[in-house]
Amino acid sequence: MFIENFKVESPNVKYTESEIHSVYDYQTTELVHEEKNGTYQWTVKPKTVKYEFKTDVHVPKLGVMLVGWGGNNGSTLTGGVIANREGISWATKDKVQQANYFGSLTQASTIRVGSFNGEEIYAPFKSLLPMVNPDDVVFGGWDISGMNLADAMARAKVFDIDLQKQLRPYMESMVPLPGIYDPDFIAANQGSRANNVIKGTKKEQIDQIIKDIREFKEKNKVDKVVVLWTANTERYSNVVVGLNDTMENLFASVDRNEAEISPSTLYAIACILENVPFINGSPQNTFVPGLIDLAIKRNTLIGGDDFKSGQTKMKSVLVDFLVGAGIKPTSIVSYNHLGNNDGMNLSAPQTFRSKEISKSNVVDDMVSSNAILYEPGEHPDHVVVIKYVPYVGDSKRAMDEYTSEIFMGGKNTIVLHNTCEDSLLAAPIILDLVLLAELSTRIQLKAEGEGKFHSFHPVATILSYLTKAPLVPPGTPVVNALSKQRAMLENILRACVGLAPENNMILEYK
């Protein structure tokens, strides 16, 4: 059974006009390695920590500024939201299609809230806490190409022609602001698009981005802004002591106009200085140590890296299943070809290397979780190949071969072919990232014994489900298994309304 909304009635939850206040018993374990009777042994001790959560229920008017607004992802997301807001339908060769938000965790997935008369009851994910309605989001942003969004949509060739014709009047007047362009960080083949760039030193470029954010906020009368990078994949930046290893050194490097400070890092600096959440949707190391240092000291949300939309999402599910079933993956070979501008940019070795790192690390935590299967330091052979094939456009082909060892020396091979409509998969993920980033800025918590409420750590692990290479605070374990990431996100939001984590025990029927 499906219900549209619900309210929790519990002595641990209080609803007021301004907030939802919950008291939550967090049950976890601590491990102790101790000597007993002359030998060391591991002892697992269950413990309960009481937490309080406070969620501001005022839903702000949200502005979203995309870096790379005129790219395939930016034009697809903007057009998709307009189509939903306006209730647009269009003819395909199969049927009359209605606009929807399929592919969005917040808008098109459900959570289990309990059972009634022997039937499980589900509610929309977005009903857990008050969230921004995507139809109300105001879009803007930057792009090194000055093409308006209607023409960018046509260039992308993602939407059906009938839909493009209906969207064009809404999008013709949308023109990206000039963007930061540094040819050293992206493929040379992007130079022909760069007709809309911010001039000046790196310090002047940061100042211009700050000015742009303030003017966008004022012009559109939005309460909050979230900025997200959906522009070209950059090459990795060199992390050097004295250059970008601390906040102070990063600022000094900007003042010296050091060449190794990337455009994405400049956007992130501007956002942090404005206390605007910044999310990196590409695989490069935007968040150099000095930038993370700055975000922590300013307590400004940052998240990333790289949208998890197609092949990698499948991989984080399949390898988790195999290792969890006691099957040993020994070889993972992933081949991709695509024909959009992302593929064109990734044809350069230095930008491909960023993507290769992002895609290759996704199985690490699953492998390290099972020392029965893997010796210390042992790891599956893992190869990632990406090729640019212009004809296929945005329809990325992903082919994977998984070879595993099974019972008594046997071998098992799984081969997958996945046609990933790149931007149609990425656009709802971008939407989820900005909506959840905004929501998380309205949540405060404190553990028993802490005097004051505080926000989540600025490095937003809560967004991990949506990214290939989750950014985590220093010293925090990286979790890539998709089911664990979704459970973490859902259970944190459940805690905010005093609901227990979904453990699937269903003891009442045992």
Swiss-Prot record:
KW Glycoprotein (keyword) present: no
Catalysed reactions, semicolon-separated: D-glucose 6-phosphate = 1D-myo-inositol 3-phosphate
TM ranges: none
Binding sites annotated in the UniProt record for NAD(+): 70-73, 143, 180, 190, 193, 230-233, 281-282, 306, 309, 340-342, 355, 393-394, 422-423
Location relative to the cell: Cytoplasm, Cytosol; Nucleus
An MF annotation (GO) of this entry: inositol-3-phosphate synthase activity
Pathway as given in its UniProt record: Polyol metabolism; myo-inositol biosynthesis; myo-inositol from D-glucose 6-phosphate: step 1/2
The EC number(s) this enzyme carries: 5.5.1.4
Species assigned in the record: Nicotiana tabacum (Common tobacco)
Cofactor: NAD(+)
Task of the protein: Key enzyme in myo-inositol biosynthesis pathway that catalyzes the conversion of glucose 6-phosphate to 1-myo-inositol 1-phosphate in a NAD-dependent manner.
Keyword Lipid metabolism: yes
Annotated InterPro entries: Myo-inos-1-P_Synthase (IPR002587), Myo-inos-1-P_Synthase_GAPDH (IPR013021), NAD(P)-bd_dom_sf (IPR036291)
PANTHER family with a match to the protein in the record: MYO-INOSITOL-1 PHOSPHATE SYNTHASE
Family classification: Belongs to the myo-inositol 1-phosphate synthase family.
GO biological process: inositol biosynthetic process; phospholipid biosynthetic process
Keywords linked to the UniProt accession: Cytoplasm, Inositol biosynthesis, Isomerase, Lipid biosynthesis, Lipid metabolism, NAD, Nucleus, Phospholipid biosynthesis, Phospholipid metabolism
Protein name as it appears in the record: Inositol-3-phosphate synthase
Lineage top rank: taxon: Eukaryota
Annotated Gene Ontology cellular component terms: cytoplasm; cytosol; nucleus
